[in-house]
Structure formats: structure tokens, C-alpha cells
Amino acid sequence: FFSALKTSGIRKDHQLIVYDGMGLFSSPRVWWLFKLMGHDKVAVLDGGLPKWIDEGRPITDRAEPGETFVGKPYLQNHLIADFDKVFVSVREQNFEIIDARSVGRFNGKEPEPRSGLRCGHIPGSRNIPFRKVLNEDNTLRDSCQIEEIFRSAEIDLRKPLITTCGSGVTAAVLNLALSRIGYNNHSLYDGSWAEWGGRLSAPVAVGAD
């Protein structure tokens, strides 16, 4: 990621706005990556390119040439969780783990799209499919709605949170939603189910709990 920045023309003092072609899907992951690298001046375009086009706003097919990036990343380790951190948290129950995958994949009743992965979820984790925090037009729900979604899932917001999904992409949608409600004690399990489900040493739960 940092290697790509070197020819991007992005500077540390730039205010960044990231977007994707699906509304809110991969852009929160990019937002999180910039945060992880210590670039705080980054926001997500709500609704992405589809909403921008629907509103009749200007678009172009030209890309501005980039300049050499000057600077270095300052990794914000509190924003990322690795396998060991999640493994310990399952035993000690000192984090809330939230899974952004679909209900069927979480319960282990739908096959995983990646071959060789077990079905189910991390024991003790809760399920909030990422689309639940989005409106029909793929914009982020308002703060009150998001808070109610997390409360309905019995998430204890007094604990630090770890988000997870299939590969670490849509989990970032939940991180973005948490930031919208002013809750900042959250990290993202980068390996997500692609790592957890592929490790035979990792415990797996099936069903709704």
C-alpha cells in the first residue's frame, strides 16, 4: 500500500476523499488503510461514484499525473488485530468481535467462497452483516440507526471492538459506522475468516451463537 503511495502525488497535509464504484464497499477499506498508515485527513464519499453520478455531478476519464510521495508511514498498531490478538481475546473475552459477513456464512449454513475454508464463525463473535448499516442507496445510515443496530446485536460498547469479515474488506464498513457514532476504540482483524477459517488450530462455532 505504501509503495503505491510513492507515485500517487499524495502528501501528508492533503485532505483525502476516497470512493468506490459500488457505493460503500471497498472505499472504507482504503479509508482504514490510510488511517492505519497514520494519515488522519481522510474521508469516505458517502454513496460513492453511483450517487455522485445520479446527482448529475461532473466526472472525467482523465487521471492527474502523480508526484513522488515524500514521507513515511507511522503505523497505528491499535487499529489492526492479528491472529494472536483475536485468539487471546476469544479465551479472555476482553473484546467484542463483530463479523460483517452474511447471516448464512456466519451460521455456517452457506459455503465460503474460498475453497478449503471451514464454515462458521469465531466463537463468541456477534454478527452484523455490513449491509445492515447501509441504506438502500448504499449510503451509511444515520448515527441513531447505527447505534440501535449495535445495541440490537447485544454489542457491549464499553469494551474495545474487533471487526472481521471474509478477507478484511467489508469489516471496514463497520469500522466506518462505529466512527460515525463517535466510537473510536475499534480495530480490524486483517486476516479475517480467510485466515481464521484456514487455520486448523483456530476454534470454530456454528449456528446463531
Model-derived features with residue positions:
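Short, flexible loop segments at boundaries between secondary-structure elements
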Residues: 126-135, 193-194, 198-199
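Cysteine-dependent PTP/DSP-like catalytic domain, specifically the C-terminal lobe
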Residues: 184-209
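Active-site neighborhoods of enzymes that stabilize oxyanions during catalysis
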Residues: 49-122, 200-209
